[in-house]
Amino acid sequence: MFSESAAGMPSSSRFASLVLALLLVLPAAASAQTIYSYTDENGVTHFTDRKPDTDIEVRVQRATPEPRTLLTVRRTGPDEAPVWWFQNRTQGPLAVRVDLADAFNVVSEPALPGVFVLEPGSERELVTIGAFDPRRSWRYQLKTETVPGRPGARHNPEQPYRLPLPPEGEFLIGQAFGGEFSHNEPANYHAVDISMPIGTPVHAARAGVVMDKARWFSSSGTRRDYHGHRANYVRILHDDGSMAVYAHLDYNGVSVRPGQQVRRGQVIGRSGNTGFSTGPHLHFVVQVNRDMQLVSVPFEFQGPNGEAFIPRAGRRVSAVD
């Protein structure tokens, strides 16, 4: 959420004080941290933010997580008639709700509240604010909320989803729809957690366009308020407006870029153990923007004989190309 406060005196004094605060659903970049990397006897490279207790050569580097800002806001125009511009930092549609709070003697064009959809990577002039009576003082707070995706999108896949796994090996579904540990909110109720070793290739379950990503987080834990927004992930937009999220990816474990078209079965990254997590696994969920709320939707995977199945906790699964 973005919140801006402004107050003005009569226009003859041409005075306005602005206090800006950026409060996003997703946090801004974290401070730089030390990353240790080493290659074990099996040839697997590990990344950690704790110094490893090993005799193997360890490399040390500094990394700063990328900003995860979905929206930037800037002001132009004179103090007595500020114009607010909004830029979508993702490569998919972004819905923005704009509203006025604590407003006195203020008029806006267009009238607020309102919901606007910013196209991928676009910037638009959305709101102009001014005093209703220019002879009197005025004040307001401009508040915004952002939700990825186009409101009203309907999930309508043409075929079951491909399991987001490499074609060899079996993997255990540790948590499925409505899982008690963490699948208990609208955004992740219809999600699956698939246990897999760190560094396992993650494949696109459905074709689409990479909308957003994060790749520089390196730690995990169970403090939801801290770790909940610190997972590496890829968000892919589908042709029906739904979006798939592949989360808890490894440090620097994203191999696609925003705006890139990906095909079903393409490798998009490596599994990991970042963010709100108790162990290495892949979190997979399909979401839509429903009335300015991210809501997960039920889906089916393709089984070994081409049949569709609903994921269940405890089932061992294999991908089929």
Which stretches of residues belong to each language-model region?
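Short, cationic interaction patches enriched in Lys/Arg with P/S/T/G and frequent prolines
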Residues: 2, 29-85, 89-125, 130, ...
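Active-site loop architecture of trypsin-fold serine endopeptidases
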Residues: 217-226, 271-283
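Surface-exposed, glycine-biased beta-strand/turn segments
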Residues: 115-230
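Short hydrophobic beta/alpha edge segments that flank linear recognition/processing sites
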Residues: 234, 263-275
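Short histidine-centered loop motifs in beta-beta connectors
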Residues: 197, 203, 238-265
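N-terminal secretory signal peptides that target proteins for export/translocation
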Residues: 1-13
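Bacterial N-terminal signal peptides
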Residues: 17-27
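Acidic, glycine-rich catalytic/binding loops that coordinate metals and/or anionic ligands
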Residues: 156-177, 203, 226-229, 254-263, ...
